[in-house]
């Protein structure tokens, strides 16, 4: 979260599920409960909203540090099959479009 804050990132793209064939592929660095806050050093992270969008999940976060607040959105692609590739590219293109269109022109880089 410190890197997100320091580089003024507004968008995070996650291309994997948390587990694949019962093996951890991505550490869950957010709360599962909407409106629950977690503290990471000087940064407080609150999950504001979770939305299921078919092939991906959209999460809206509020980051607070030193009385300053920023919004960050995370997109997690969940349609990637275990140990394989998607049958078609359409779901991945929809995911990419959602990620790119959510990126403000003045923001830092997209974190993948």
Swiss-Prot record:
EC number, UniProt record: 3.1.3.48
Residue stretches making up the Tyrosine-protein phosphatase domain: 1-112
Keywords: Hydrolase, Protein phosphatase
Main enzyme class: hydrolase
PANTHER family for this protein: PROTEIN-TYROSINE-PHOSPHATASE, RECEPTOR-TYPE TYROSINE-PROTEIN PHOSPHATASE
Family classification: Belongs to the protein-tyrosine phosphatase family.
Identification of the protein by name: Tyrosine-protein phosphatase 17
């Amino acid at each position: 979260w410190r890197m997100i804050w320091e580089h003024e990132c507004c968008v995070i793209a996650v291309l994997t599920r948390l587990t694949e064939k019962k093996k951890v592929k991505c550490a869950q660095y957010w709360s599962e409960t909407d409106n629950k806050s977690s503290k990471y050093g000087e940064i407080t992270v609150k999950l504001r909203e979770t939305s299921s969008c078919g092939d991906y999940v959209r999460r809206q976060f509020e980051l607070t540090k030193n009385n300053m607040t920023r919004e960050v959105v995370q997109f997690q692609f969940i349609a990637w099959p275990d140990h394989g590739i998607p049958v078609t590219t359409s779901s991945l293109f929809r995911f990419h479009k959602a990620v790119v269109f959510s990126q403000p022109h003045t923001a830092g880089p997209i974190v993948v």
